[in-house]
């Protein structure tokens, strides 16, 4: 039976009662989002659908000057995230709000703040695949946070130089580009995630920025392979996640 406490190097995640537990998707997004070759460091971050608070805590660890806000529609998960943030070394820089990011009343919590970095690991299952309990359905099914509405809302909350970072199924890229163009965002980074070299990519890490035009410039897409061989991890995966995981990795260079 899985433990309710997942320990990282600088913080713990208590998952008691939470529908969605710590997983590879969240860890990848928290480690990947906001990397910028130009050296731009976000000062104000927003985690939409923060769940246990995992990604919010990862951002607080990576960006010591940043203030991080998490928003979670499930009140049980929001309380869990608050407790995890309060127990962390970053408690003075993290605020967790309970509510629906699509609800205009949340302006009272966000105020006029615009964010340099918005992240989300959104639900992506379709309504025909409902989980038996409501809490898990909210966490896993897109009807609670449709991708287009998420991108629309994020575009309203981004600062002029802000970035929106997402992890989604790879097959949603066409939809992502359509919705981003509608709300005048362009892609700046795309990373396909493969578990093994011979497997098709199942996940996509994508980053989007406000644009003067709604034309997607289709940036170079790179690939992250988690396991170059069974039982081993790639150097790139280790580089991303080593600051967080407490375990040692068996590394095998790709190529």
Curated annotation (Swiss-Prot):
Its EC number is 2.1.1.223. GO terms for biological process: methylation; tRNA processing. Gene3D superfamilies: Vaccinia Virus protein VP39. It comes from the Bacteria. The keyword Repeat does not apply. It catalyses: adenosine(37) in tRNA1(Val) + S-adenosyl-L-methionine = N(6)-methyladenosine(37) in tRNA1(Val) + S-adenosyl-L-homocysteine + H(+). Coiled coil: none annotated. GO terms for molecular function: nucleic acid binding; tRNA (adenine-N6)-methyltransferase activity. It holds the Pfam family MTS. The keyword tRNA processing applies. Belongs to the methyltransferase superfamily. tRNA (adenine-N(6)-)-methyltransferase family. HAMAP family: tRNA_methyltr_YfiC. Specifically methylates the adenine in position 37 of tRNA(1)(Val) (anticodon cmo5UAC). This is tRNA1(Val) (adenine(37)-N6)-methyltransferase.
